[in-house]
Amino acid sequence: MAAHRPGTLKQQNKAHKGGRHRGRGSAQRDGKGRLALKTLSKKVRKELSRVDQRHRASQLRKQKKEAVLAEKRQLGGKDGPPHQVLVVPLHSRISLPEAMQLLQDRDTGTVHLNELGNTQSFMLLCPRLKHRWFFTSARPGDLHIVLDMAKVADTILFLLDPLEGWDSTGDYCLSCLFAQGLPTYTLAVQGISGLPLKKQIDARKKLSKAVEKRFPHDKLLLLDTQQEAGMLLRQLANQKQQHLAFRDRRAYLFARAVDFVASEENNLVGTLKISGYVRGQTLNVNRLLHIVGHGDFQMKQIDAPGDPFPLNPRGIKPQKDPDMAMEICATDTVDDMEEGLKVLMKADPDRQESLQAEVIPDPMEGEQTWPTEEELSEAKDFLKESSKVVKKVPKGTSSYQAEWILDGGSQSGGEGDEYEYDDMEHEDFMEEESQDESSEEEEEEYETMTIGESVHDDLYDKKIDEEAEAKMLEKYKQERLEEMFPDEVDTPRDVAARIRFQKYRGLKSFRTSPWDPKENLPQDYARIFQFQNFTNTRKSIFKEVEEKEVEGAEVGCYVTLHVSEVPVSVVECFRQGTPLIAFSLLPHEQKMSVLNMVVRRDPGNTEPVKAKEELIFHCGFRRFRASPLFSQHTAADKHKLQRFLTADMALVATVYAPITFPPASVLLFKQKSNGMHSLIATGHLMSVDPDRMVIKRVVLSGHPLKMFTKMAVVRYMFFNREDVLWFKPVELRTKWGRRGHIKEPLGTHGHMKCSFNGKLKSQDTVLMNLYKRVFPKWTYDPYVPEPVPWLKSEISSTVPQGGME
């Protein structure tokens, strides 16, 4: 009898799983004291219904709208400072006096003329619009005046030409202003009514299309008639303001009147009285004051004279004669400052910030073993006394000629000459080659010259500086060599490599190998200040500025600042027409430290810029001269030095300079031989960090002489046996990606046996990387000479391809 077998449709009962339904005690034991996340109720989580969400959104919109309206009412109103407008013509055909005359509308309000040197300025009071404007002007070629006045202007009014918009000078001015940071701006066209009616529409269309590249989605206004000027004033009054971060957290002031009281001891130094309206933040007398272009100073007291331009003057009846609506302010500035004088605040010596910018180093407490300048000078004198060496020279050689004969025992120079020493052989070769080429070219020009030469060529040649052209050609060649063979140097034959590169070290990995940022610091690091945590200090200072109530002059007050120990040259510059602008410094901003700035090469400039070359910096509200180091902008703890400012990537410029809290814009200029400042790079301030390590790399190269399976004999990297043994622990690499080490030296001429992780090719090159930390030079100079008005150069700075080979 067959056994019964279950079919496929037999019922399968679910197995009992005892671990699923646990009791409370077992769950607590398994949780080991951990508590589950409690779900919040709808009321506790403050979840709003759809109606409440709409109501809340409408309230937020209303608050933002009220904040914008309050800002508009305060700027130019009776309780705020005048609305400062900077008028900048962007083309040489624009008539600036005509535009300023149109803005002085007699029907709109009262006009107070104020002549500040060469700059035209006036105050316009309009009780009907409840607004007052302060108009100033600047030519686009006057670089310092435009940039300084744009720092404090509430609105910039750009005047455009109806046919071209702006010329080369105006385009250069716009590039600088965009890099520094633009406040609120308005575009106006002057002269379009002078065109025929048929061409006016076409001109406006072409101009709008051309302006879209710089100012997308911006409306063009007209400025040819009095009615159009009135519409422009309404636009300026109702326009939403754009803020600049670096000035909103500081108190600043544009000087309307200046007086100087010489000191009894020294006539060249005295007390400077600056009168103007406080802007930005509350001005405290115990803070330091930075006068743009002149330095940092202390304040004695702040006076509060009466407002010379009230929006609604009391006790003055309106004039019946409409011609009397224009009132010319011809009173003395000193009388304005002393009228209705009231002392607002005096400096407290216990709370006033010090002008100390550097730490006075104590040589007895330093832990660094770096030699001082006196020890270096003594060592040089000792070497000079003991450097009498007997040399074999040809017969008839004088002692002076014998000094030029190279000897194998000469040592390398100091650290400051390492850039020159690294590329000495390349430079000597290039100089000889350039001299030979220049002499051949001169002979060829002399042989082929004819009497019928063009006069235009002679005039063109007179503008060319041959020495400057030769230096520029040499720089182009060095930059080209650096691009083709980055960081490669030739091992000197007259100096032992272990002596020449004694300050360098090898690293197994540039990214992960440790490097102590506090070792072998230079003597200049004893003079600077460093924060324990720069980010936290910056946040706490900004929070104090925004939340804490500061005692002093409120925003919108007309005040007179008594600034002590000011040189008389500041007043002379003001009387010559240079605007005087003062910024209140935040704590620690007068102290020296190491600033790191992220910069990118300006596309309009192609001249090579070498590291440690003197440049002019516009950093926030400061400008100064310094010699920066360029390094790669990476997230690692070590950053490779770049010998040139490259155009294809952003780099970090490192300099010694006074502390500035970011955000702050950075502009780099280079002064030409004719005194003109050329824009090199633009960027922003990244950090104030002396511990940021800039590492210089040198690459020694060798040639494989004999190749085996994984072994090779390499020559030309070193030239004696001792150097091979000295650099034996350093890892080797090749351009084709092989890795290896030195096994042993062969002979006494620098040949060495090396092992690699693969077979070498005959066309491969063996390389050795050596690293050394470098520091910027202390070349900080707060004095920057006034630039010559900018003009586009007629001579192209490009180098022909034949000269680069």
Swiss-Prot record:
Superkingdom, taxonomy of origin: Eukaryota
Keywords, alphabetical: Nucleus, Ribosome biogenesis
Ranges for domain Bms1-type G: 81-242
Transmembrane segments: none
GO cellular component: nucleolus; preribosome, small subunit precursor
A Pfam family per the record: AARP2CN
InterPro entries in the record: AARP2CN (IPR012948), Bms1/Tsr1 (IPR039761), BMS1_TSR1_C (IPR007034), G_Bms1/Tsr1_dom (IPR030387)
Residue stretches of biased makeup (Basic residues): 13-24
Region Disordered, residue ranges: 1-67
Residue pairs linked by disulfide bridges in the UniProt entry: none
GO process terms (BP): endonucleolytic cleavage of tricistronic rRNA transcript (SSU-rRNA, 5.8S rRNA, LSU-rRNA); maturation of SSU-rRNA from tricistronic rRNA transcript (SSU-rRNA, 5.8S rRNA, LSU-rRNA)
Database matches in PANTHER family: PRE-RRNA-PROCESSING PROTEIN TSR1 HOMOLOG, RIBOSOME BIOGENESIS PROTEIN
Protein name as catalogued: Pre-rRNA-processing protein TSR1 homolog
Species this chain originates from: Pongo abelii
Lineage, opening ranks: Eukaryota, Metazoa, Chordata, Craniata, Vertebrata
